A protein has these predicted regions:
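Electron-transfer interface patches adjacent to heme c in soluble/periplasmic c-type cytochromes
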Residues: 61-75, 89-99
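Solvent-exposed, polar/charged alpha-helical surfaces in well-ordered, non-transmembrane soluble domains
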Residues: 29-33, 37, 75, 79, ...
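Periplasmic/extracellular electron-transfer cofactor-ligation site
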Residues: 26-59, 86-92, 107-113
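Membrane-targeting and insertion segments and their boundary/processing signals
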Residues: 5-6, 38, 47-51, 55, ...
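Short, functionally important structural connectors and interaction interfaces within domains
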Residues: 56, 61-64, 80, 85, ...
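N-terminal export/targeting leaders of redox proteins
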Residues: 1-25, 110-113
């Protein structure tokens, strides 16, 4: 194979992989809307957790802005949202909606600073 053809194939591959990863990122604005509709009842307006929920389920909720939560990968967070985590039941969302919620929760750490 000619060198120029090999370079062209590598370039196409790099572009495709970049687009694939870019497509996986959510929309924080949409995520805030979904969070408000489906998550705020337990997690609170800014993801700080609600004391009544903690008491009801005998759990200590980590703030979504915490280092412990923010250090998780998007994939880990998506699994927790879609499959549930401990006493948190799975949330019925499409994968794209879950990605949007995760993008929004990433903004909570920035607001904390």
């Amino acid at each position: 194979m000619k060198l120029s053809l090999k370079l062209a194939l590598v370039l196409v591959l790099v572009i495709c992989v970049s687009l694939l990863f870019a497509a996986g990122k959510g929309d924080a604005k949409k995520g805030k809307e979904i969070f408000t509709a489906k998550c705020v009842q337990c997690h609170g307006e800014k993801g700080e957790g609600r004391p009544a929920i903690e008491k009801m389920f005998s759990v200590k909720m980590r703030p979504l802005s915490s280092k412990e939560v923010q250090s998780k990968t998007d994939e880990q967070l998506q699994k927790e949202v879609l499959d549930g985590n401990g006493k948190m039941k799975p949330v019925k969302l499409a994968q794209a909606e879950a990605a949007d919620v995760i993008a929004y929760t990433r903004t909570l750490a920035a607001e904390k600073k």
